[in-house]
Amino acid sequence: MILKQQDITQQKPFVDASVTTTWTIDLHYPEKPACACDAFQSVAKQLRISPYPIPYRCLYSRNIDNLMMAGRNISVTHVALGTVRVQRTTGMMGEVLGMAASLCKKHDCTPREVYRQHLDELIAIMTEGVPTRRVTPSGRTIGASE
């Protein structure tokens, strides 16, 4: 799935809503060539939005079975990228993909199969959030000590 400007501005609901972002659609364009200003100057155009969720389906590859992405390489259009590209949002993508990776390991499945077969479980983990202490699949305890 490719997230588009219309999905954002029309607040399209997604069953696999994963990361919520509130950043404006923030697009930067170079100054007109006739500008006598610094060559690296640009013009920013910002379109305010309401908070919206990025679908989990934007965070894995459509043609490479075991590839997940967090950051500027997710499945979005140029305009939609203007709002998902900030560090706080990309960091949250990483958290969601860590959760999805744990389900891939647990169920011996691909990221796409997490969406198709284990979405309720992923949503439950996302709702719980990132714990400070957890037991890994190998039985090791990680995180803050009590």
Model-derived regions, located:
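Flavin (FAD/FMN)-binding glycine-rich loop and adjacent Rossmann-like elements that form
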Residues: 1-146
